[in-house]
């Protein structure tokens, strides 16, 4: 389960009246806290919880490290990403992070999915590596 990113760090929040961004940051944080508490209270196991806020903050701070060229201008301009295809996108927007004021682009979704995949697969890689390391240490 992926929680909300910091909505206060979106182009929508940047274009909103003064004071809106901190409020949106607080609201997205409160939602994520309630989501986590609800998940814990449900007693359900086997559900991985991912908080994308640190990832989004890092992408916004260091976009080029992720292949992102722009984190402030939506690929669809002022339009909603709903119904905004390649023909409606602004030129050069394939490396933008936001499709519209709040929604991520295809590139952003790929970055997020890579992050989730690496988080889920890392424990198995460590498990595979540990016996190999023990074996190599034994024979050397």
Segments predicted by a language model, with ranges:
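Extended non-globular C-terminal regions
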Residues: 138-139
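Mobile gating loops/cap/lid regions near enzyme active sites that modulate substrate access
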Residues: 6, 11-25, 41, 45-102
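Sec-exported extracytoplasmic/periplasmic mature domains
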Residues: 36-44, 61-64, 114-122
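Histidine-centered active-site loop/cap adjacent to the catalytic His
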Residues: 79-132
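Mobile, glycine-rich extracellular loop/lid and propeptide segments
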Residues: 1-4
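Stable alpha-helical elements in mature extracytoplasmic
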Residues: 27, 31-35, 49, 108-112, ...
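Aromatic-lined glycan-binding groove of carbohydrate-active enzymes
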Residues: 35, 55, 105
């Amino acid at each position: 389960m992926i929680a909300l990113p910091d909505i206060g760090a979106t182009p929508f929040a940047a274009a909103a009246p003064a004071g809106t961004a901190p409020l949106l940051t607080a609201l997205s944080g409160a939602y994520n806290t309630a989501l986590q508490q609800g998940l814990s209270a449900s007693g359900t196991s086997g559900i991985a919880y991912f908080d994308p806020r640190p990832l989004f903050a890092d992408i916004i701070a260091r976009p080029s490290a992720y292949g992102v060229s722009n984190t402030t201008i939506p690929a669809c301009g002022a339009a909603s990403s709903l119904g905004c295809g390649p023909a409606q996108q602004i030129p050069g927007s394939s490396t933008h992070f936001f499709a519209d004021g709040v929604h991520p682009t295809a590139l952003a979704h790929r970055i997020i999915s890579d992050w989730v995949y690496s988080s889920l697969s890392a424990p198995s890689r460590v498990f595979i590596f540990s016996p190999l390391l023990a074996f190599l240490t034994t024979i050397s």
